[in-house]
Amino acid sequence: MKRVVIAGTSSMVGKTTISTGIMKALSKKNNVQPYKIGPDYIDPTYHTEATKNKSRNLDSFFMDEMQVRSIFKRHSKNKDINVIEGVRGLYEGISPYNDVGSTASVSKTLNAPVILLMDARSLTRSAAAIIKGFKSFDTELNIKGVIFNKIRGEGHLNKLKEAVKYYDNDIEIIGAIPRDDGLSVSQRHLGLVPTPENKQKLLERIDLWGNTVEECLDIEKIVELSDESFDFEVDEKNKEETLWKVEKNNSKIAVAFDESFNFYYWDNFDALEENGAKIKFFSPLNDVEVPDCDTIYLGGGYPELFSEKLSNNKSMIDSIRNFDGKIYGECGGLMYLTNSIDGKEMLKLIDADAVMTPNVQGLSYVKGTFEKDCIIGEKSKEFKAHEFHYSKLININENDFSYRINRGKGIINSMDGITSKDGDIVGGYAHQHCIGNPYFAANLSKT
């Protein structure tokens, strides 16, 4: 299984731009399977557009080593090469004392060659020191190459090459990307702008990234390095049941998917389908009513940017308010379930109001415990998730909660998962993953 990790020396060095460009360039001749390390749900949408294969998350906080390998192996079948974008800097994880949640952790678990990506502005000899430090910090890692980003010109690149090769003749210099503001992509408070927004413009940008990578990097060298991968074993007993609970249910789940709601882990959909669910996508922004279903799944996104249009779609609001099945909303979906977002009327199914703030309100890996059986979990079971939001809930009237947050923030007083009296509606800030919460899919797919 050919595989390679594109790892940054830090955040903001151009990982998504260049990783997506590599995926796009390789896809012209190869069937490329993309991955994102960490809990990000926006970057994978860029990978998916570049390769036409759904990008998957690999995360050593949500998953143990065997689960990381199992997820990788099930999606790498019949693929020519697997390209894995890292998270933050190579060694950043949840702790300063170990590599859990880091790019390094997943790279070692997969025995994958690593290509370092470095912002080389104003660097020459220091680049050699950075590479030497990264290689010596953990000798179990297989750091094979380096890409320089934002170089000034050919003279700058030649000095970089001379310095790096003088101190480390084994490192492969894959190439360099010039400084060009035209290669950048718009960002906002939760990260990159998701691909469902202004999709045509973003597709043109991805084409530009792919063409730039072809011109500036040695693509064949990347393929050659990926061919040096060591194989690894996956326990044949480690089937889906050890990734997530599987019950043969028979339900229809309507998933909100449009410009306002698109933060999802695609493996969650696989897990739901393996539990017998039939998934239908719909748009709270543009559709008239929710499709025929047993359960509504409202994922995260940017409902605050589309609050007026959401509020004005009265037929959809009435359709969801009158729905008599189960409804699960997380983060943006939770906001939609409340009385209002910044004063714009919403579903009024959870008695609270969502307001945006200038500062991050929750940004953390999450550990939690279910206080009761609910539509996404089982009493006393623990789960791992992720939260990242600038909104908060106010005017929280008497509400019941289904889970306690032991690491992270939740909605209020370390509680999350506001639950309706009949238990059919749950809304929380934690983004659930089907491996971090192995009961998620089995419970949500029940009729």
From Swiss-Prot:
Function, as annotated, reads: Catalyzes the ATP-dependent amidation of the two carboxylate groups at positions a and c of cobyrinate, using either L-glutamine or ammonia as the nitrogen source. Involved in the biosynthesis of the unique nickel-containing tetrapyrrole coenzyme F430, the prosthetic group of methyl-coenzyme M reductase (MCR), which plays a key role in methanogenesis and anaerobic methane oxidation. Catalyzes the ATP-dependent amidation of the two carboxylate groups at positions a and c of Ni-sirohydrochlorin, using L-glutamine or ammonia as the nitrogen source.
Name of this protein: Cobyrinate a,c-diamide synthase
Q: Where is this site: Increases nucleophilicity of active site Cys?
A: H431
- Reported EC number(s) for this entry are 6.3.5.11, 6.3.5.12
Needed co-factor(s): Mg(2+)
The record's section on Gene3D superfamilies has: 3.40.50.880, P-loop containing nucleotide triphosphate hydrolases
**NCBIfam families associated with the record:** cobB (TIGR00379), F430_CfbB (NF033195), PRK01077.1 (NF002204)
> What does the entry note on its domains?
Comprises of two domains. The C-terminal domain contains the binding site for glutamine and catalyzes the hydrolysis of this substrate to glutamate and ammonia. The N-terminal domain is anticipated to bind ATP, and cobyrinate or Ni-sirohydrochlorin, and catalyzes the ultimate synthesis of the diamide product. The ammonia produced via the glutaminase domain is probably translocated to the adjacent domain via a molecular tunnel, where it reacts with an activated intermediate.
Q: Which GO terms describe its molecular function?
A: ATP binding; cobyrinic acid a,c-diamide synthase activity
Cysteines engaged in disulfide bonds, as pairs: none
Active site per the UniProt annotation: C331 (nucleophile)
Q: EC class of this enzyme?
A: ligase
**Family statement drawn from the similarity comment of this UniProt entry:** Belongs to the CobB/CbiA family.
- Pathway listed for it? Cofactor biosynthesis; adenosylcobalamin biosynthesis; cob(II)yrinate a,c-diamide from sirohydrochlorin (anaerobic route): step 10/10
From the broadest rank down, the organism's phylogenetic lineage runs: Archaea, Methanobacteriati, Methanobacteriota, Methanomada group, Methanococci
Native species = Methanococcus maripaludis (strain C5 / ATCC BAA-1333)
Q: Please report the stretch or stretches of sequence annotated as the GATase cobBQ-type domain.
A: 252-439
What gene, per UniProt, encodes this protein?
A: cbiA
Q: Which domain of life is it from?
A: Archaea
Note from the entry: The a and c carboxylates of cobyrinate and Ni-sirohydrochlorin are activated for nucleophilic attack via formation of a phosphorylated intermediate by ATP. CbiA catalyzes first the amidation of the c-carboxylate, and then that of the a-carboxylate.
| Record's catalysed reaction(s) | cob(II)yrinate + 2 L-glutamine + 2 ATP + 2 H2O = cob(II)yrinate a,c diamide + 2 L-glutamate + 2 ADP + 2 phosphate + 2 H(+); Ni-sirohydrochlorin + 2 L-glutamine + 2 ATP + 2 H2O = Ni-sirohydrochlorin a,c-diamide + 2 L-glutamate + 2 ADP + 2 phosphate + 2 H(+)
User: Its Gene Ontology biological processes?
Assistant: cobalamin biosynthetic process; methanogenesis
Keywords tagged on the record: ATP-binding, Cobalamin biosynthesis, Glutamine amidotransferase, Ligase, Magnesium, Methanogenesis, Nucleotide-binding
